[in-house]
Amino acid sequence: MLRNSRKIFTGNVVSDKMNKTITVVVNVYKKDLLYGKIVKKSRKFYVHDETEKAKKGNLISFMETRPLSKTKKFRLLKIIFSNDKDKKQ
C-alpha cells in the first residue's frame, strides 16, 4: 500500500489506559434518504501511540498502517486539540 493512498481519520480519544494504545471514536453524520433525518454513526478504532502523549478527550488525526497487532491497524499522526484540564496555573 502506498503511503499517499492510506486513509486519514479524525476522532476523539475515549480511552488511554492501555500501553502505547488509545481508543478513538469517529462519528459520521448522514442524512437518511427515505425520511430525511440525520443519523449519527460511530466507529471505534485502536490507534498506536508510541509516545503516549494523547489523553482522554483529545481530538486527534490518525492514519492507516500495516497491522501492528490483532486489532491495531492505525497510528497517531498529530494531536489537533488538547484538553488541558490537568494543568494548574
UniProtKB/Swiss-Prot annotation:
Statement: the UniProt record of this protein carries the keyword Transport: no
Gene Ontology molecular function, alphabetical: rRNA binding; structural constituent of ribosome
Top-level lineage group: Bacteria
The keyword RNA-binding is annotated on this UniProt entry: yes
Pfam families, alphabetized: Ribosomal_S17
Chain ranges passing through the membrane: none
UniProt entry keywords in alphabetical sequence: Ribonucleoprotein, Ribosomal protein, RNA-binding, rRNA-binding
InterPro entries attached to this UniProt entry: NA-bd_OB-fold, Ribosomal_uS17, Ribosomal_uS17_bact/chlr
GO annotation (BP), single: translation
Range of residues in the leader sequence: none
Annotated GO CC locations: cytosolic small ribosomal subunit
Quaternary data: Part of the 30S ribosomal subunit.
Its biological purpose: One of the primary rRNA binding proteins, it binds specifically to the 5'-end of 16S ribosomal RNA.
Family, as annotated: Belongs to the universal ribosomal protein uS17 family.
NCBIfam families linked: PRK05610.1 (NF004123), uS17_bact (TIGR03635)
The protein, known as: Small ribosomal subunit protein uS17
